[in-house]
Amino acid sequence: MTTHTGTPPTPASPPLHLQGRILPEGEVCDIWIADGRISREPVGGSETIASGGWILPALVDAHVHLGIAEIGGPLDFEVLRNDLRHLTHSGVGAARILGSPERLPAHMLSRPGEPELLTAGVPVAAFDRFIPGWGRRVPDRLLAPACADEARCGWSKIIADWLGPDGGYGPSFSAHAIEAAVSAVHGIGARIAVHTQSSVAGARAAAAGVDSIEHGMHLPPSALDDLAAHSGFLVPTGFVFEQLKESMLDSSQPADLRRWFAEGLENHPDVVIGARDRGIPVLAGTDLPVGALVDEVVWLHRSGLSAHDAVGAASWTSREVLDLSRLRHSDRADLIWFAHDPRDDLEMLRSPELAVIGGEVSAAAP
């Protein structure tokens, strides 16, 4: 029998208990939640809130920008709070913020009842090669120290290519500068992500040993070989580019820009398949706007990932790759529950029947 209470507990409620098939393994297990943490051992006096059904580690948006009221504008804390509420009630228990107009306050990164946040500080870009008003602008020789400085919360991000004055999309930094940045960030125990939408910059980033490639529409097969060799991962954010298709291919756009975008859009599923075939983890990320994570999961499935791997890209795979809680004993309690297997219908992911985020029940169907 598949049941859940549908009633969020009060702050004084007892420890919680769930029983169901836990993905990705699919084995029937019991989970207890006490003091905001997972217990794989029975906890006395617990209240059963779900029995039967399917339990997943809460969703993860592996590439998102929160608190953005307008492109190029400052960080808006009211928008940030609204974004966090939306993610929480959508069953998203963690998000990797890959670049913000300013650094997020440390006290916001892991709070009970809200998603756990990984952040890359302010993205590091070349002069005149990023969105006006955003980014930390540096010349080639200062890329490495800037990236290391921004990596104080565990991640740094390079805008490795951008639109140039000629209307083309090409590298912003030399191969040597990217190699030095990777070495500097890894030297302090942090990781580095790279925005790339050109084959040259993508190849340079992968060869340098970056930890993640973001977008990568034009990533060549050789770059995927290097990414695999360095145990990197891919976050394609493909759905956002599908949404931009009409405007980017409009006849009012420069011909070179239209060609670049059309070729990248056509190549993007092949990049996903190439990553899959090389054993490179593919994670689900939305970029902007907030709230399209399930659309990205659907896009990944349509682009060649199995339903199992597409769901994993927004759940257990992301959590393992990003070293987030994933239903182990003493992990932070972040999970979602469904009466039926969401791999059979990805649209189910839009409305978790029960979500526990940061140890607190945040969503429950009546």
Spans of model-derived segments:
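Metal-associated gating/positioning segment near the N- to mid-region
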Residues: 53-111, 128-133
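Active-site core of metal-dependent hydrolases
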Residues: 165-266, 277-283, 288, 306-310
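Histidine/acidic-residue-rich, glycine-tolerant segments that coordinate divalent metal ions
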Residues: 101-204, 208, 212
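Short amphipathic alpha-helices and their capping/turn segments at secondary-structure boundaries
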Residues: 40, 45-47, 51-53, 104-111, ...
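Acidic/histidine-rich helix-loop elements
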Residues: 66-77, 127-138, 165-171, 246, ...
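Hydrophobic faces of well-ordered beta-strands that scaffold small-molecule active sites
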Residues: 58-64, 95-97, 118-121, 156-158, ...
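His/Asp/Glu-enriched, well-ordered alpha-helical/loop segment
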Residues: 187, 259, 264-341
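N-terminal metal-binding scaffold of metallo-dependent hydrolase/deaminase domains
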Residues: 1-44, 50, 54-55, 340-345, ...
